[in-house]
Regions:
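Binuclear metal-ion centers of metallo-dependent hydrolases, dominated by the metallo-beta-lactamase
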Residues: 67, 111-190
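Binuclear metal-dependent hydrolase catalytic cores
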Residues: 1-104, 116, 170-190
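A general structural motif
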Residues: 84-88, 105-112, 135-138
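Short, hydrophobic beta-strand segments that form beta-sheet elements in well-ordered domains
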Residues: 102-105, 156-158
Length: 190
């Protein structure tokens, strides 16, 4: 799932090659139209094999559109994913709703048409880059305001900049809110 075309969300694409070579099959990747165009422009070798290359393509690019659910097949049952649009500076990034979980990694605003996707959540993973304003990311206070407004059972703040100390932030957060950490596992109800 690609949320948008920025480098911090796309430049790990080459790290998928060993997985594909091990599995001996391409991986399905999902992106909206603008992100897909950007991926093809920068990483076309991941989707097609140039005539001079012995490396196979590694990804099948599948379309995503805000407001249109898609079933993602895997080893178990298909997972129903609902992409929805988010303001991220000058662009629209995607957030994802999967059952009772919402993932909104890069945003500085939530359009009215995306509010329903954030209702009745068990878990909301939400961007909070830093304490001071940023043109394309929520601050900690903005994230907490939205958490208070939408009332998920649990919220996890992610995408924190290096100037946010994990322990200090966690000590200040409401009981149902915590800071994310590398290796964190989230168990969903049901």
């Amino acid at each position: 799932m690609f949320t948008h075309e920025h480098a911090d969300h796309t430049h790990g694409i080459d790290d998928l090659r060993p997985l594909v070579l091990h599995q001996r099959r391409r991986i399905d990747a999902y992106a909206d139209e603008l992100t897909a165009a950007s991926l093809h422009a920068r990483f076309d070798y991941c989707f097609t094999s140039p005539a001079s290359s012995s490396y196979p393509p590694i990804l099948n690019l599948r379309p995503l559109a805000a407001g249109t659910s898609v079933a993602i097949a895997g080893q178990g049952e298909a997972i129903e994913l609902l992409p929805f649009g988010l303001a991220h500076g000058e662009i629209v990034a995607l957030g994802f709703r999967i059952g009772g979980l919402a993932y909104t990694p890069d945003l500085n605003g939530i359009p009215d048409e995306s509010l329903d996707a954030l209702s009745g959540l068990d878990v909301w993973i939400i961007d909070a880059l830093r304490y001071t304003p940023h043109p394309s990311h929520f601050t900690v206070d903005q994230a907490l305001e939205w958490i208070a407004r939408k009332k998920p059972r649990r919220a996890i703040i992610t995408n924190m900049h290096v100037d946010i100390d994990y322990a200090t932030l966690n000590a200040k957060l409401p009981p149902n809110v915590e800071a994310a950490f590398d290796g964190m596992q989230i168990v969903l109800p049901g």
